[in-house]
Amino acid sequence: MDPLSAASKIAGSGLEVQSTRLRIVSENIANARSTGDTPGADPYRRKTVTFGSELDHVSGVERVKVKKLGVDRGDFVHEYDPGNPAADTNGMVKMPNVNVLIEMADMREANRSYDANLQVIRQTRDLVASTIDLLKASQ
């Protein structure tokens, strides 16, 4: 495989994993206040994504892939909300272990990574087009 095609393939895998990362972040943000339905029930637990590399045997390039989708085993936060159906006898409710500020920072990083991979694909496409134009002009 030529180097430009390899670069596009690698960047394409980067787009895929960053899309997954953005989906997970959006799920976490959307569920940041999702409690259990009954007293003592666990609320939404923050999801995580882990990346890994994988050799593409056809092209010979190392691509990035989603290695594992998991959950954050961190502690839940307890809030006083006696009117909540999930409140215990003391009025305390288990709240998700999602920190929206951390999720927003993760979202920005994923967006930047996605944009960088997209730029690699655009640059590669432009280089291929320039090469084709150069070859046409020399005939």
Swiss-Prot record:
Does Ion transport appear among the keywords?
no
- Alphabetic keyword roster: Bacterial flagellum
List the GO biological process terms: bacterial-type flagellum-dependent swarming motility
Gene Ontology annotations for the cellular component aspect, listed alphabetically: bacterial-type flagellum basal body; bacterial-type flagellum basal body, rod
Annotated InterPro entries: Flagellar_basal_body_rod_CS, Flg_bb/hook_C_dom, FlgC
Tell me where in or outside the cell this protein is found.
Bacterial flagellum basal body
Report if keyword Cytoplasm is assigned.
no
Instruction: State the PANTHER family in the record.
Output: FLAGELLAR BASAL-BODY ROD PROTEIN FLGC, FLAGELLAR PROTEIN
Q: How does it assemble?
A: The basal body constitutes a major portion of the flagellar organelle and consists of four rings (L,P,S, and M) mounted on a central rod. The rod consists of about 26 subunits of FlgG in the distal portion, and FlgB, FlgC and FlgF are thought to build up the proximal portion of the rod with about 6 subunits each.
Question: What family is this protein classified in?
Answer: Belongs to the flagella basal body rod proteins family.
Protein name in the entry: Flagellar basal-body rod protein FlgC
Say which species the protein is native to: Agrobacterium fabrum (strain C58 / ATCC 33970)
Source species taxonomy? Bacteria, Pseudomonadati, Pseudomonadota, Alphaproteobacteria, Hyphomicrobiales
The primary gene name is flgC
